[in-house]
UniProtKB/Swiss-Prot annotation, chain B:
Any one Gene Ontology molecular-function term assigned to this protein's record: heme binding
Pfam families: Cytochrom_C_asm (PF01578)
GO CC list: chloroplast thylakoid membrane; plasma membrane
Family, similarity comment: Belongs to the CcmF/CycK/Ccl1/NrfE/CcsA family.
Chief place of localization: plastid
An example Gene Ontology biological process: cytochrome complex assembly
Compartment(s) of residence: Plastid, Chloroplast thylakoid membrane
Alphabetical UniProt keywords: Chloroplast, Cytochrome c-type biogenesis, Membrane, Plastid, Thylakoid, Transmembrane, Transmembrane helix
Protein name as catalogued: Cytochrome c biogenesis protein CcsA
Transmembrane residue ranges: 17-37, 48-68, 71-91, 98-118, 143-163, 225-245, 259-273, 286-306
Subunit structure comment from the entry: May interact with Ccs1.
UniProt keyword annotation of Membrane present: yes
């Protein structure tokens, strides 16, 4: 080709014939060869590994020459075999062919080192490897849900005993050495995720981007024979390529016309969106890493009316966690209250928070609830929990006393709090008193000294209750608000990734479903591409096409489209032949 | 009270209609000539669809929130989505094999919802504080739609597997007789893929040609429905993550339900990747999708059955308190 080029630049059409055709042949070869390149690939890997072991075994300098020979041999085989996927990126680019030759001849130690990253890339972008990674991540995650997470070692000694191993081999030793007791932060799992991330990058770099480039390249076929050799071909007597072009455009093809030649393809959008999906995944992974290494978390239960400082609650989670100015903010819980359904169940709980800076100035005030957090200076405060901290009780117009409430353990998810008002001599060993129980801030159940039920009072009702001659008024029930605080620098990145992922998934679906109406063109990476060539040959048009998927449907579609091409009546024939010659 | 009666009536109408539709489907399977019956079964599915819509709307009105807050409601919603998936090709005047999957699916989910273990769950319940968010509609509807579409697609893939395996066994037998030479399964697949059907000389009989076409159709429809399901699942998981960042304090908590949804997502991502690879396409992708069927059920049902994690709302547990 390089020899031919300088001799033929006189007419542009001739130039095209000789320049474009080989690239196209190369492309088609690549597509056809794909099933075979795979097996070669795996051979490659073995070979490259072999050569590496040789290098490491023979560290003696005397064997250097043998080593180099070895490398040469392996390098040559590797290049010729692994070339197709990489070459597809370069060969059509025009000048790419010139570069290819020196690489082949100049295989030495240096060349080997130069090509090493490329080989690593080729291994990493290997699809079966990526599938294996995804599969093992899925299995690890499933294991993580089956094995109870974050328990003490004794728990695993009991659950996975050595005497009676699960499936014959699975004991606590496996769980603890592999870190499956904290699966989602175990080195095995994180390593697998990192590997998948690297594979994603390699695949995007070596396979997807070059294929998208190839898809954009125009290649016309200028001989009728070449077109007839396509998987699908047809001969339309009395037709014009222009008409065909219009019809193809209507069917969603990108159409390029030059003189009598037509080239049309579709499936380009379906090629760019997978790149977007992969980039979005990488963005999410990056954001998650940032979250894991650079965030602060903490939770606190604050009774109504008390304060806390943000910085005291938050604890760092990774080495990138750095405190900010906002950590000095003081938070005051103005009020904690709950909403109830008519049936008495809790509907929602709210906390009225005020934020003060170092000078004691109120910088923000907001009532938060579940699903409605407060955000200030990168800190987010969530309403997550509640409890009852104290009862304000008046006894015979004395007080009010603050009685601390303690959580009582009952089965089920319901909460129960209780307190005790001693009656009589407080210092006696078996002191008796009035018990008060509360499920929520709505109503308090009172029991007398014998433990008999007396009645129910609502706080704030000011309605006294008479127990053994004592007048008890429950003034108020003071709740405490369970807050969770966090700073997370990864969230914007992750959200950007979410947005991108959603968009690109939609795009790849839409781009492909729009085509699917006609041709089944596929979803991920190097798939779903149909090409059509046509050539005006006198009054006839020769049409050829190929696709890499759904051949039957492609033929069906093309037949439908070709039926639409209008037949040219005699009078306009002369005009057509003009076009053909011009 | 009127709402409850209405709901009762609608449940029973839709369930009996869908049972009749199933019977008609079986009849048309046995006897091909009943074109009129096929049409009436389509009308039956339309009736089911409207009944289920009515059921969901009634529940929405009297409970005051979107009726997908517990297992019973989500099962009804699931069968509603199945009936939608059934309707769409019908309106596009496409006769396809999807309907043989969607109609029984509607039947089974609805049957389970109305008859199964869940009788005490029929009363609609109040929403716990964490569920009171606009995200509920987006997240749950997307997830359930995703499950429905993915279930349909994976069932189609399973059907493909069954048909392919039957075919391959038969062909291998033939080859043994004629050529005294057996082909590995993959090789036959590969040859089938590689050769254009119209120039197909390897399997000249028309019977094999129709089979091949059936397999292609199953593959095509399975892929279409799976890709839309995957889209829904992606949106569902992402909206769930955003919601979790509003309600639970983090966008990802490794909660069992969350994890299984991610496993489902990964499995179907593997499906789409196997399909693009020419070496692995066809059979292998169908196998992956069939695995996906099990995974979806574990995710949708199994996790709630265990009653663990943050997602254990409105489900029944096997261990009673």
């Amino acid at each position: 080709m390089d020899i031919l080029n300088p001799t033929k630049p006189l007419s542009s059409s001739l130039f095209n014939t000789h320049f474009r055709r080989p690239t196209l042949l190369l492309n088609s070869k690549i597509l056809k060869l794909k099933p075979q390149t795979h097996t070669l690939y795996s051979n490659n890997n073995k070979r490259s590994r072999l050569s590496v072991t040789i290098v490491t075994c023979s560290k003696l300098k005397t064997s250097k020459e043998i080593k180099e020979k070895d490398k040469n041999a392996s390098g040559k085989i590797l290049l010729s075999n692994s070339a197709p996927p990489v070459l597809s990126e370069e060969s059509g680019g025009g000048g790419g062919n010139g570069e290819k030759v020196p690489v082949k001849t100049g295989t030495g130690a240096l060349g080997f080192l130069k090509r090493l990253p490329r080989k690593v890339l080729a291994v990493l972008s290997n699809l079966p490897l990526a599938i294996g990674e995804m599969f093992s991540i899925a299995v690890l995650m499933a294991l993580g849900t089956l094995i109870d997470q974050g328990e003490a070692p004794e728990f695993y000694f009991q659950k996975f005993p050595e005497e009676n191993p699960l499936l014959g081999f699975f004991t606590w030793k496996w769980v603890l050495t592999l870190g499956f007791d904290h699966m989602y932060s175990s080195p095995v799992f994180l390593g697998m995720l990192a590997l998948l991330g690297v594979s994603l990058m390699a695949c995007t770099y070596t396979t997807q981007i070059p294929l998208a480039k190839v898809a954009r390249r125009w290649n016309y076929l200028h001989s009728a024979d070449a077109i007839r050799k396509q998987e699908f071909s047809d001969n339309l007597p009395k037709a014009s390529v222009q008409d065909l072009g219009v019809i193809l455009m209507g069917a969603g093809y990108e159409v390029f016309l030059k003189g009598p030649s037509l080239y049309a393809f579709k499936g380009l959008a379906g090629r760019f969106s997978p790149i977007g999906v992969h980039l979005a995944m990488l963005l999410i992974m990056g954001g998650a890493t940032l979250s894991a290494t650079g965030s602060f978390r903490g939770s606190v239960t604050v009774p109504q009316g008390l304060n806390f400082v943000v910085g005291d609650v938050l604890g760092p989670s990774g080495f990138l966690s750095t405190p900010t100015e906002a950590f000095n903010t003081e938070v005051h819980v103005n009020r904690f209250y709950m909403d109830y359904y008519d049936g008495g169940d809790i509907k929602q709980f709210h906390t009225d928070l005020s934020l003060f800076d170092l000078n004691g100035k109120e910088v923000m005030r907001k009532t938060i609830s579940v699903n409605d957090p407060l955000r200030y200076g990168g800190i987010t405060m969530y309403q997550t929990d509640w409890s009852i901290s104290a009862l304000q009780v008046r006894k015979d117009d004395e007080g009010p006393f603050n009685l601390a409430m303690a959580p009582l353990k009952i089965s089920g998810d319901n909460k129960l709090y209780g307190t005790f008002l001693p009656v009589g001599d407080v210092n006696s060993p078996n002191v008796k008193g009035i018990s008060m129980l509360a499920r929520d801030l709505q109503s308090i159940v009172l029991y007398d000294q014998e433990g008999k039920f007396v009645g129910v009072r609502r706080p704030n009702s000011k309605l006294p209750i008479d127990i053994d001659g004592m007048q008890i008024i429950i003034e108020d029930a003071i709740g405490s608000s369970g807050l969770e605080l966090k700073t997370d620098p990864g969230v914007p990145v992750v959200y950007a990734g979410f947005g991108a992922l959603m968009l690109t998934t939609c795009l790849s679906y839409l781009s492909h479903s729009q085509l699917i109406a006609n041709v089944c063109v596929h979803f991920v990476s190097y798939s779903g591409k149909s090409k059509i060539w046509a050539l005006q040959d006198g009054t006839a048009v020769i049409v050829g096409g190929k696709t890499n998927r759904a051949k039957a449907e492609f033929q069906y579609e093309i037949n439908l489209l070709l039926d639409k091409v209008p037949e040219i009546v005699e009078s306009s024939l002369s005009k057509q032949s003009d076009v053909a010659s011009g | 009270m009127i709402f409850l009666t209405l709901e009762h009536i609608l449940t029973h109408i839709s369930f009996s209609v869908v049972s009749i539709v199933i019977i008609i489907h079986f009849l048309t399977l046995l006897v091909n000539e009943f074109v009129g019956l096929y049409d009436s079964s389509e009308k039956g599915m339309l009736t089911t669809f409207f009944c289920l819509t009515g059921l969901l709307i009634t529940r929405w009105i009297y409970s005051g929130h979107l009726p997908i807050s517990d297992l019973y409601e989500s099962l009804i919603f699931l069968s509603w989505i199945f009936s939608i998936i059934h309707m769409v090709p019908y309106f596009k005047k496409h006769k396809n094999y999807l309907s043989t999957i969607t109609a029984p699916s509607t039947f089974f989910t609805q049957g389970f919802a109305t008859w199964g273990l869940l009788t005490d769950m029929h009363q609609s319940k109040i929403l716990v504080p964490a569920l009171q968010s606009q995200w509920l509609i987006m997240h749950v509807s997307m997830m359930v739609s995703g499950y429905a579409a993915l279930l349909c697609g994976s069932l189609l893939s399973a059907a493909l597997l069954v048909i392919t395996f039957r075919k391959v066994i038969r062909i291998v037998g033939k080859n043994n007789n004629l050529l005294n030479d057996s082909f590995p399964v993959d090789e036959i697949q590969y040859m089938m893929e590689k050769k254009s059907i119209f120039k197909n000389t390897f399997f000249p009989s028309s019977r094999n040609y129709y089979r091949f076409q059936l397999i292609q159709q199953l593959d095509h429809w399975g892929f279409r429905i799976l890709s839309i399901g995957f889209l829904f699942l992606t949106i569902g998981i992402l909206s769930g993550a955003v919601w979790a960042n509003e309600a639970w304090g983090s966008y990802w908590n490794w909660d069992p339900k969350e994890t299984w949804a991610f496993i489902t997502w990964t499995i179907f991502a593997i499906y789409f990747h196997t399909r693009t690879n020419k070496n692995l396409e066809g059979l292998n992708s169908a196998i992956v999708a069939s695995i996906g069927f099990l995974i979806i059920w574990i995710c949708y049902f199994g996790v709630n059955l265990l009653g663990i994690g943050l997602h254990s709302y409105g489900s029944f547990t096997l261990i009673s308190n």
